[in-house]
Amino acid sequence: MDGRCIFSSIDLKTMEFYKVVPKDLDGIVSQLRITKGVECAIFLYQTKTLEYKVSLRSNGKVDVAAIASYFGGGGHVRAAGCTMQGTVHDCVNNLSEQIEKQLIKAE
């Protein structure tokens, strides 16, 4: 995706160690999105074993609502979210496939 998409994640063990709650994570995905050259940002945090809450942000070239909807979530073109099952790598790979399709379509 040529650096047009950025992702970050935090696992449950790290959240527990630092006493982080989901509210503490508000805004991280938006900060990722403003990285120069990034058109789509993904932030995942683990809620239980093999389950992640996913936040997606876009500059508009990627319809993150469509991506979230594909995975059972919802939102708006520029801001959306969903819950996914699997490892963080599985989640990112599955999201990346959908983002890549949209980036190709937008060109």
Language-model region placement:
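Hydrophobic helix-and-loop "lid/oligomerization" segment in the mid-to-C-terminal part
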Residues: 1-70, 75-107
